[in-house]
Amino acid sequence: MRSLALAGLVAITAAACAPADQFPSEPGKGVDVGFLPSERGLTDKTTGLIDLWNGSWVAALAVGVLVWGLTIWCIVAYRKRKNDDQLPVQLRYHVPLELMYTVVPVLMIGVLFFFSSKVTADFQDVTPSTQAAGTTSATGEINDEAKASDLEIEIYGKQWSWDFNYLTDDVYYSGDRISLTGKEGVEETLPTLYLPVDETVTFTLKSRDVAHAFWIPAFLYKVDILPGRTNTFQVTPQKEGVYSGKCAELCGEFHAEMLFNVEVVDRATYDAKMAELRDAGQTGRLGDELNRKYLVTQEDQH
């Protein structure tokens, strides 16, 4: 048993000390390796989220050290001594101590809530000039200090694919439903969302049928997509690359295959992709008329 434990310790140590290039990983693609959930500067928001992540860990470790220290101290200092048969002093309650047990955790949660909501609001708030009529951010507020949007993209989640309306460029992309194509998880057939690097994008999120969630793991942010509700968020991609996206809300049989890719490219490449959609006749916008409730109503009428 001792040799087995030693072998396990050696294996873990070797894995921890292995060069980073033995574990190739691209943020959002494959398995990310390391303590940090993404990389700083990937978007204009990831640095703040990573700081929140690190700060939460530091605070949790500080509390843990304090609790563990006091626990160990009590175990050692007040342990039962040899030939000590006396019953310790019994206390039914200790009001100051119980108040401390209540107030301190509430204060800790309040501090965590303050910093979490501050970082989250930075994603969700958009400028009045770019927020579409009838939409709300998840906070229900508008931040006058938010960046002016360079690009507006409307996204529809549907069982089980995605529609992307590039409103600024007046073109659209409609993903094929996995249930119709039978090509589950085939990389070449996944919908691809193109974003220009270093340009602020305002996303408007809607559902065509059931509850979905729009999630780009490398961006460290997820937004629910709910029927009858429109949510928005704003982000500026700052590093070119290909990142995975997925639905993060259980939405039926092919939920696990409701994937997409995000390609952050230079402006020239982005314009070329928009031109390809335009040349394919995919101009305009795919609106609510393709939502399930409207399609079902039309079928009933016929």
For the regions a language model picked out, list residue spans one by one.
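N-terminal secretory/membrane targeting signals
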Residues: 1-22
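Transmembrane alpha-helix boundary/anchor motif
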Residues: 12, 70-73, 115
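Non-transmembrane, membrane-proximal soluble domains of secreted or membrane proteins
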Residues: 18-55, 78-302
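Alpha-helical transmembrane segments
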Residues: 55-78
